[in-house]
Amino acid sequence: MNATAEILMVEDNEDDIAVALWAFSKHNLQGRVEVVRDGQQALDRVLAQPLGQIKVILLDLRMPRVDGREVLRRLRADERTRTVPVVVVSSSSHADDIAACYRLGANSYVCKRYSTARAGEYLIDVVHYWVDLNRIPESPGQDQK
């Protein structure tokens, strides 16, 4: 467990994880990322974190134990995690999958890109926006900046 992780990547495909970690390392973000490999681990991890520490969740849809849609539904149903940004990162470009994720409260939906020229780099753009530019509500009791 990375106690300082701001980015939680929920992905079960080892190749996708390797590409993402390579891109994060290339941009000196590896210390800010934690990877979990199924939906139940994601829920356990998010609920164990102090509120506001995780700045974005990168969530795959098709995973063992608890799938991405159910993770999203549970995160949005819980007052503690309702405002944590969730970006669905999926190989599916089906309109039904995209619409379902937005209905469940996804903040964004990104289709995985497999081009070797920019493999993993699209995640850097996503993370830059959600971690460095976007602001989420502060947790109760935290000082406002």
Regions found by a protein language model. Name each.
Residues 114-126, 135-140:
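C-terminal output helix
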Residues 21, 35-56, 120:
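Acidic, metal-coordinating helix/loop segments flanking the phosphotransfer/catalytic sites
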Residues 63-66:
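Receiver (REC) domain active-site loop signature in two-component systems and cognate sites
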Residues 3-4, 29-30, 52-56, 80-85:
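His-Asp phosphorelay/catalytic-motif detector in bacterial-type signaling
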